[in-house]
Amino acid sequence: MTLSPETPAPLGTDTGPDLRETPRIYVACLAAYNNGRLHGAWIDATEPSEVMDKVRAMLAASPEPDTEEWAIHDYEGFEGARLSEYASFETVCALAAFIGEHGSLGAKLYREFCDDLEQARAAFEEYAGEYRSAADFAEELTRDSGTEIPASLDYYIDWTALARDMALNGDIMVFQTGFDEVHIFWSR
């Protein structure tokens, strides 16, 4: 079956573009900006050398002469992670790759560790798993440890409170990434 541009694809078929957003940055020419002109380019955060080449091309096309200074004025696709306007392209591309691999969970970890990418990466060594809730994690951990809970007491255990106490005591970190979707990390 050949689809013409006017014929919509049947439901359930994958014929459209990948809707996953590639992290990108808007790099502005500071000489133009300081003279009241907006001149810049949206650049995919892929490889630092490619980003720098595109920045050089953008600066060469600037309406101001002899431009060499730039700044990151906007960004998208970083799932809420923050970028400095003078972040190195190595940092930008490394963060983009990390978020590409881990999605919003990666961005949440990056923010949790004060924008330290190495600490966010290291946190995955202490990943305990994905659960419907932190209470489910606390219950599974308790039951898997061999603790016998009599059936008559089972309904009296507040798994939510236990999970909250584990988080407040610094034993675990809990990140919610969706409805009934939490990720637990040990805080060792």
Regions found by a protein language model. Give the residues of each.
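N-terminal ordered "arm"
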Residues: 2-61
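Non-transmembrane, interaction-prone alpha-helical and coil segments associated with secretion
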Residues: 3, 8, 76-79, 83-87, ...
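Structured domain cores in non-transmembrane regions
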Residues: 49-118
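Phosphate/anion-contacting hairpin/loop surfaces
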Residues: 109-110, 117-145
